[in-house]
């Protein structure tokens, strides 16, 4: 009987220690690196990566099958819930900044060569000609459809994608009851609870 008590105490102690384990996950995503530290008895490395991949499937211009890439090519006006979240946050920040933040700048970004390589800088005339395609007033969300009010409008969500990736991982942790975590993707950070003291 005494041995059984010792075994049970030992198991409780081991399980208690496992709950205090801080886990670390890191790698490359969205053209940058990520670092995630969280306290959990479960290893969520695969799930963390899956949450980040949701952003690539929806908002990456480098994934030709992403929602935003198909929308830009005019193949579909239908968008997914993550795209809608991005659009609504982008519109909100656009209004707060008086238009300084604008995800419809993709034609200008591409002309300057940041997205798709371009050897020479665009002329003032080229820039002026592209401005007709820039502005949140050029698109309208209608349920699960994002309608182009001006043909030629494109979006570049790279300025908001890393933050959305961080939010998705944090929401996953919250659903799983993880109380202590730090998520960083390319400088975008979200923390909750206590830090790892080691």
What are these regions (language model features)?
Residues 168:
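Penicillin-binding protein/beta-lactamase superfamily catalytic region
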Residues 4-5, 13-158, 171-181:
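A contiguous, well-ordered beta/alpha segment that forms the leading edge of an enzyme domain
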Residues 23, 179, 187-198:
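Hydrophobic/aromatic-rich core segments of domains that either
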Residues 165:
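Short active-site segment of divalent metal-dependent hydrolases/proteases
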Residues 184:
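Short beta-strand segments
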